[in-house]
Amino acid sequence: MGDAPEAVAENRALLRSLLPANPIWLEQVHGTEVVNAQNHLTGDAAPRADAIMATAGGTVCPIMTADCMPVLLADTRGNLVAAAHAGWRGLASGVIQNTVKQLQEAGADEILAWLGPGIGPERFEVGEDVQAAFQHLGPAAKSAFVAVAGKPGKYLANLPALARLVLASVGVVQVAGGDRCTVSEVSEFYSYRRDRVTGRMATMIWIK
């Protein structure tokens, strides 16, 4: 990120003063691990995971991003929530499926989803390896990749469309968001792909 640890701590303290409870920060690794916030209330080291859920009030579930897409989930009764870090690696590997499964095992019936700001489909140039990583989603995934003219083996990937496909595959069809691009909206969002050395945005969800 390029920021001094003291500045990060100061910013997080300021953010905490505006929140109803302590956020449980994660050590995000582009994986699929999901943790329950209620198991990490003691202020220990950040859990190594890419999704966090809450089954009760008294904590905040944050996800840090700067091109990867934050995905917020909640059951319609409002007593279960989760936040997931959905870059292409985590999305292809199952971070959303794992998060939805954990919510369902905790009692969620109908789940709503919101896709936060991430790299948009006109800016996310990828190679054949990324396209291949989503083959398991079937023919519908192919429409999320548009070949780049004059660049064999290169595609523009639609991360929100892929997220919607993944969500639909696990029964989540009420999905909002996914229309903000971190790369293009320079004055609004941090972007690692655009700036390399940059800050991170925190997207959060909690139970009242």
PLM-predicted stretches and their roles:
Residues 1-208:
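Active-site microenvironment for binding and transforming phosphate-containing groups
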